[in-house]
Amino acid sequence: TAWIETRTEEEMKIFSKIVKITHNIINEAFSSKVIKVGVTTTTDVEWWMRQKVTNIGLETWFQPSVDIQRNDEINQDHLRSFSNRPDKKVIQKGDLLHCDFGITYLRLNSDCQQMAYVMKDDDEQVPLFLQEAFKKGNQLQDVLTSNFVEGDSGNKILLNSLKQANEMGLRPSIYTHPLGSYGHSSGPTIGMWDAQSGVKGNGDYPLYKNTVYAIELNVTTYIEEWNRDIRIMLEEAGFYGE
């Protein structure tokens, strides 16, 4: 094993707290406390998250991002590069929100992507078609983590997971990376968004125990009610070890 990627028991106690803080900030950012429908923009939420982290004495290791998928969208913003992503979009009822957010504490880093639906006046719950789409995202998470085998390379884990997901009828994309002393830490790279056939070098590195990963991936699914594809984009910290 390599010492930079290996997490100690004490570090994992801290890591759990970092992830909990990250989730709590996202929950608040996506609540009516922060978002005023028809007024608040995606950029407003991004900077609220940044300021919240500063207020509690921590740091972000990258600028938070918030984007929207909606049923009347002509341009599929989730297919754009981050550098070409439109900003200051006003959040409306019926929007599907997505954020990418991570913080740093005691040299450890979180990296999280979560989504939220802005309910319309006649919604009693998240629409079933979105619930089904999220289930597909969760299925891919389960497929990927079930293929974590000590000693297997990142590329082997990637290809086994994609094969299994495709056989299940999913439209997967996996780009999972180690987390630790720096954001994209040392350890095996398990796919990149533009390298779904494997990553030369970093993807050849084996998986060791007592390591942490950003389980980062997405599933594309067609939403008949919106007459378009959407992506369920998820990222959660995961510990592989004893």
Task: Name what the model sees in each region.
Residues T1-E242:
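Active-site neighborhoods and metal-handling regions in enzymes and metal-associated proteins
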